Amino acid sequence: MGRAKKVVLAYSGGVDTSVCIPYLKQEWGVEEVITLAADLGQGDELEPIREKALKSGASESLVADVKESFIKDYAFPAIQANALYENRYPLGTALARPLIAKILVEAAAKYGADAIAHGCTGKGNDQVRFDVSCTALNPNLKILAPAREWGMSREATIAYGEKFGIPSPVKKSSPYSIDKNLLGRSIEAGALEDPKFEPPEEIYEMTKAIADTPNEPEYIEIGFTQGLPTTLNGIPKDPVALIQELNQVVGSHGVGRIDMIENRLVGIKSREIYESPAMLVLIPAHRDLESLTLTADVSHYKRGIEETYSQIVYNGLWYSPLKAALDAFIQKTQERVSGTVRVKLFKGNATIVGRWSDSSLYTPDLATYGAEDQFDHKAAEGFIYVWGLPTRIWAQQDRG
């Protein structure tokens, strides 16, 4: 008897998930494999995906258009949280996984599958994100992870697929692993595994090399409503269109590249290359607007929440009780985070050069050093005495 009768497989059309189809049937005795690909804004690469899945042995191949949900329900909350894992990575891939898990579980229920499967290896973070998310949504479903057990190198995986007529989208001489969605691209493997190796320009698609960027700066204005980006240069945009346009504009100025050594959940360090133009402007712009509209104590406390939020999303705990509790706090903080941020794009830099809001807590008459100054300087002496009183008492006690 096989490990499952009917399986819904998370499918990308790449090497690992394509090889999973014959592997599940030939090696694990699965009778029927239904593939499910999430349209997260990858672009043209999804066009032939049904045909490839069917040729690889799938009984049915599904594509779910979840672009709008991806941005509204996953990316936008992350922007409100200023989510940057290890203060650099805007979680483009990590944010997609709980959504894919959700539609996998829904498809399994619809088609009567007794298991779901994915092509994640045992060294990556995605296996955790898929397994934990699917378990949270339906703890009774079996989860199969062939790539975690088959023990094949990337070259061997490609060779296994070729035996079943599965073409590889990568060359054996340059086997980069690429994941792409509306929020950006992640590139790893191959020569990039050497951390001293400079990434070749050929791996980038969304961002221009500095030498090829415009010689004049471009200014953009991003409007936020309760922490959510809603306008670009004064024009209302739906969530997907806003991200798409920002990716194009920001990337054309060479902004949005990340080359980092990342601490994976499974305990190893990995070299990761990311392109994420829109998010690497939206998050700093949102944080800047918060500095104008949040009180100091809320702003400072939220920084710690943001770090925890980034970690639990990265670590696959999107559907956890802690995540839900943090969401409630973050949503409360966003009630007055409405306004506009002006950003200058030039030669690989995105510089915030202005911000304004009807909810601004910045008071010019109190901040100015000019003749309009209304700050009560005499009050400072009493404040300093009371503020420093514990230190004064400690110092007196310390001196005996």
UniProtKB/Swiss-Prot annotation:
Residues that coordinate or bind L-citrulline: Y89, N125, R129, S177, S186, E262, Y274
Residues that coordinate or bind ATP: A10, Y11, S12, G13, G14, V15, D16, T17, S18, A38, G119
Reaction catalysis annotation: L-citrulline + L-aspartate + ATP = 2-(N(omega)-L-arginino)succinate + AMP + diphosphate + H(+)
One Pfam family, short name: Arginosuc_syn_C
Molecular functions (GO terms): argininosuccinate synthase activity; ATP binding
Keyword Repeat: no
UniProt enzyme class: ligase
One GO CC term on file: cytoplasm
Principal location class: cytoplasm
Keywords associated with the record: Amino-acid biosynthesis, Arginine biosynthesis, ATP-binding, Cytoplasm, Ligase, Nucleotide-binding
Binding site for L-aspartate: T121, N125, D126
Pathway(s) annotated for this protein in UniProt: Amino-acid biosynthesis; L-arginine biosynthesis; L-arginine from L-ornithine and carbamoyl phosphate: step 2/3
SUPFAM superfamilies linked: Adenine nucleotide alpha hydrolases-like (SSF52402), Argininosuccinate synthetase, C-terminal domain (SSF69864)
Single biological process term from Gene Ontology: argininosuccinate metabolic process
EC number assigned by the record: 6.3.4.5
Keyword hit for Ligase: yes
Cell compartments where the protein resides: Cytoplasm
InterPro entries xref list: Arginosuc_syn_C (IPR048268), Arginosuc_syn_N (IPR048267), Arginosuc_synth (IPR001518), Arginosuc_synth_CS (IPR018223), Arginosuc_synth_type_1_subfam (IPR023434), AS_cat/multimer_dom_body (IPR024074), Rossmann-like_a/b/a_fold (IPR014729)
Subunit comment: Homotetramer.
Protein name: Argininosuccinate synthase
Species whose genome carries this gene: Nostoc sp. (strain PCC 7120 / SAG 25.82 / UTEX 2576)
Top-level taxonomy: Bacteria, Bacillati, Cyanobacteriota, Cyanophyceae, Nostocales
